[in-house]
Design a protein with these regions (language model features):
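A short, exposed loop/beta-hairpin motif centered on an aromatic-Gly-Thr core
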Residues: 22-31
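Short, charged, surface-exposed hinge/linker loops at domain edges
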Residues: 1-3, 36-68
């Protein structure tokens, strides 16, 4: 599955979250680090959902850019 992620640059770090998986977040010192961490976090999050016996949410979010 391919989930959309949002990456935000802070003053000293990068943060990432997955709109389709509430609570699935990661923080890293660089963009490459946060991308690695969010991938691991998604895998861990999905495993937890499976273990609970819950249904895994299908990816439904998408991203677009708007020029202003």
């Amino acid at each position: 599955m391919r989930y959309a992620i949002i990456v935000e640059k802070g003053e000293t770090s990068y943060g990432a979250y997955v709109p389709d998986l509430p609570g699935c977040v990661a923080v890293g010192k660089s963009k490459s680090e946060v991308l690695k961490l969010i991938r691991e976090t998604i895998e861990f999050h999905l495993e937890g959902i499976k273990q609970e016996g819950s249904k895994i949410p299908l990816p439904s979010s998408s991203t677009e850019y708007v020029e202003v």
